[in-house]
């Protein structure tokens, strides 16, 4: 018989980190813990307050329900938590963890065997120019070859100057640059800003305008000189038919898939 419980854990940022939605000081997460016949499994339900579609008053109640009904099995529980994507990914992790020889090794791969690293981007948080410039230097010194810069909260001209300073020293062959606007641009100004950004050999921009403006986003994706990646646009669209229709309307160059959010 499987037993389940959960724990809340608050992660504290070493440095308050800025996005166009505000300053982040803490990150709330929930751990789902399963046990059976002396074995255990752990899954993380990574809720993002203010962003996740399942940031709702009954979130903890749903976790309690999941724990009380864990014997229903993974497939039924996933169907019953379709509006709680962060709980779904926690469930998947927890069951895989329970079934694995090592609870913290869900899949055997070159990464888990310490044979190969996974390339990730170095995230540059928003802040004043000096703060962002210090982060850029630090990430490059750490060996990152792809930087993703949050934009949209400070003066656009300053952000452009930062991108220009990187490109002055590092070519596109040396450093890949991506930007994430988190929906900060107004539809009326977005295309012009994308044209300016495209001068700096960027890989792509995430979510230039707020989600929900399908026609405006579709027009941007059609006319943009800079590839667009949908991010927040995918949050809360649970029905497969609706997801397909949205992508057919917008026709983005890329999509960002975050298991805790979609």
Residue ranges and their predicted role:
Residues 1-177, 182-184, 191, 195-198:
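N-terminal capping/lid subdomain adjacent to the active-site entrance of alpha/beta enzymes
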Residues 154-262:
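Catalytic core of soluble alpha/beta enzymes
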């Amino acid at each position: 018989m499987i037993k389940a419980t959960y724990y809340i854990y608050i992660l504290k940022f070493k440095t308050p980190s800025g996005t166009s939605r505000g300053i982040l000081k803490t990150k709330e997460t929930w751990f789902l813990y399963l046990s059976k016949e002396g074995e255990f499994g752990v899954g993380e339900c990574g809720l993002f307050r203010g962003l996740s579609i399942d940031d709702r008053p009954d979130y903890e109640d749903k976790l309690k329900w999941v724990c009380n009904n864990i014997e229903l099995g993974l497939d039924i529980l996933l169907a019953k938590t379709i509006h709680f994507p962060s709980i779904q990914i926690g469930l998947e992790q927890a069951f895989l963890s329970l079934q694995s020889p090592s609870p913290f090794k869900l899949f055997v791969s070159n990464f888990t065997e310490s044979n190969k690293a996974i390339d990730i981007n170095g995230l540059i948080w928003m802040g004043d120019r000096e703060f962002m410039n210090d982060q850029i230097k630090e990430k490059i010194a750490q060996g990152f070859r792809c930087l993703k810069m949050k934009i949209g909260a400070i003066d656009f001209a300053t952000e452009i100057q930062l991108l220009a300073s990187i490109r002055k020293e590092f070519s596109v062959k040396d450093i890949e640059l991506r930007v994430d606007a988190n929906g900060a641009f107004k539809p009326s100004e977005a295309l012009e800003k994308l044209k300016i950004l495209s001068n700096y050999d960027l890989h792509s921009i995430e979510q230039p305008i707020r989600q929900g403006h399908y026609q405006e986003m579709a027009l941007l994706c059609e006319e943009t000189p800079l590839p667009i990646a949908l991010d927040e646009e995918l949050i809360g669209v649970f029905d497969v038919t609706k997801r397909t229709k949205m992508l057919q309307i917008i026709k983005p160059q890329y999509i960002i898939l975050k298991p805790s959010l979609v």
